[in-house]
Amino acid sequence: MQTLWDVLIIGGGPAGGLAALDCAKHGLRVLLVEQRLFPRWKVCGCCFNNQAQAILNSRGQNNLIVDSGGQALRSLRLGLRERETTLALPNGYALSRERFDQALIHAAIQAGATARFHVTAQVEAASPEYRRVRLKDHQSGATSHAKARVVLVAAGLTQRCLPKHEAGLSDIHQQSRHGAGCVVDDDSHHYPVGAIHMAIGDRGYVGLVRREDGLLNLAGAFDREALSQGKGAIDAAQHVLNQAGFPVPEAVQQGHRWQRTAALSRSTGVVAGERFLVMGDAAGYVEPFTGEGMAWALTAGAAATPFVLKGVERWTEDLETHWKSTLQLTIGRRQMVCRALSSVLKRPRPTALLFELVNRWPAVAEQIISSLNEAKLPSPKGEPCL
């Protein structure tokens, strides 16, 4: 007989992992499926700001980052046109996605969740009591079905888990940049631990941060045209670093392989439907800064539990409406700042003016960073927070 899960979560990133943990701690039967094997690397700045930490603390994971080896971040170093300025960065940490995501899933399993890896999921028909999901195990090749009262879709930027007639259309912003990243072994003194190093160029930007294992993580956002020329991300990154006056790590010069993402800035037409909620990057994304991307994902993961609890008891259209409002109020407002900043960074003259402002009056920039780091927890009752 098929198990009827209270909630089936598609995606083992921060949003899915935290939702699995929180739902399991509330006594729900939780199945999480992830298409890749863990640990796995992701194109990400691997930075956690105060909002991300506050969310983890609120779910009993106060020490998860530190216990996993997280490195404290105290400053943001900016480079533009061979000029530099450094700003204070409040209460940040750097931790590789390999360690963080695995630690979060491990905590969820300890709380009672079931996790399956190298498994893809396709949401199928809904019944009055549950949603049917087709699962494919890519190790054995076997296909099976699962039933869940609620499905959480946290499958990333380009998720295709929902039926076409329910998924809606993703609106990719016309000037959206594309992400690319890599991890390199770099023992130079140019990129010390404890800082986010951000190089800004006319066709993109690159963030560099030293991880807990000493490796250097590079993550950038580039114009599509920049990635289509020469050696793609390798040349695009070197161009940005050279423009900023930042040394190019030797491994990057030697052609170290980069991994690319789809277009970053996008909105999703459908974030909820009959017995499913869309969350994390799958619910819409903007080019993030100073750890905001991780904060958005964790905030969504924490916000989902009260909706799941209500949905397990009885699904209503009000849940779908309130979920959309909750995402807008808890995450959409935070994304507005990053959207405005990314818009400025696409235009050389406003970028230069902003850099001059930051250089002359760093307190103004530090106030903006503080606003991004301001912690706000989602409502424990699943009601929009005004």
Protein language model regions, located:
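Beta1/beta-strand and adjacent pyrophosphate-binding region of the FAD-binding site
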Residues: Q2-A15
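Residue-level detector of alpha-helix initiation sites
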Residues: G13-P14, F38, L157
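Glycine-rich FAD pyrophosphate-binding loop
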Residues: A24-V43
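Conserved N-terminal glycine-rich FAD pyrophosphate-binding loop of Rossmann-like flavoproteins
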Residues: L37-N57
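A conserved beta-strand/loop capping segment in the N-terminal third of enzymes
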Residues: A52-I105
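FAD/FMN-dependent oxidoreductases across multiple families
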Residues: A94, A226-V308
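Predominantly flavin-linked oxidoreductase catalytic cores and closely associated redox partners
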Residues: A107-P247
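C-terminal helical "tail/cap" subdomain of flavin- and related membrane-associated enzymes
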Residues: P306-L386
